[in-house]
Amino acid sequence: MVSRINTTSRFSSAPWFDEAQKLNVLIAGLGGIGSNVAYNIGRIHPNSMILYDNDVVEIDNISGQFYGLDDVNNNKVTAIANMLHSRCSYYNIYANNERLISPVKVEADVMISGFDNMSSREYIFKMWLDSNSKLLIDGRMSAEYFQIFALCKEDTSNIYTYQNNYLFADFMAESGVCSYKQTTFMATMIGSVITNVFVNYCTNLAYDKMKSKGYSEEDIDFLPRDIPFLTTYDASTMMFQTKY
């Protein structure tokens, strides 16, 4: 087995590293978004990773999700756990082969939604509101476009905007052509950017901790980082946009 220290040695001095390893991370939905997020955050070795999905890997999933031919017919949570073992030397995983729906309640420091339907997004949002979690990340994507929402508990205005403008009935969501719903390059990209939001959050935790210990801004050798409320990317124009 590859030792834990070797698998993180290239970034272990990052300002966010120590705080990231203290957090318990929930990833709900292991399709194109969740499977790629699990891989990226798994490489960081958080304190624990809690996975929820009740699906089985199918051949069609391989075109845009982090699975291989050997995973077909296996439960997604099992396939992702095995991938984290073999590719990340990471084992602090709670793999739940079930849907995250009522009456299931989960506590985690960070909650990440990789769902492909609005009812599940609404459920995890309400669960997050009632939890002790400080950060909710909601990823949404099509074949060549993605959106990432990041909500912090203190951002009451953004929470209101998200709840009233971005949670709507499933029938109101755009439905794409069956053979043009997902691409590997966009799935890996959104997984990376969601992980970027996660490490920015961890950087701010580290910064706030140093400030609370009496360090001045001049004494801290890194700056707090932005966490946009909404990040979008359009592959056709190769343009990122962020809103705060």
Where are these regions (language model features)?
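N-terminal charged helix/coil linker that caps or initiates catalytic domains
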Residues: 1-25
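Glycine-rich phosphate/adenylate-binding loop
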Residues: 2, 22, 106-110, 114-244
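Glycine-rich adenosine-cofactor-binding loop
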Residues: 21-45, 50-56
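Glycine-rich phosphate-binding loop and adjoining beta1-alpha1-beta2 segment
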Residues: 48-88
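Hydrophobic pocket-lining residues within nucleotide cofactor-binding pockets
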Residues: 62, 100, 141
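Hydrophobic/aromatic anchor residues within beta-strands of the central parallel beta-sheet
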Residues: 90-95
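Conserved SAM/SAH-binding loop
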Residues: 96-102
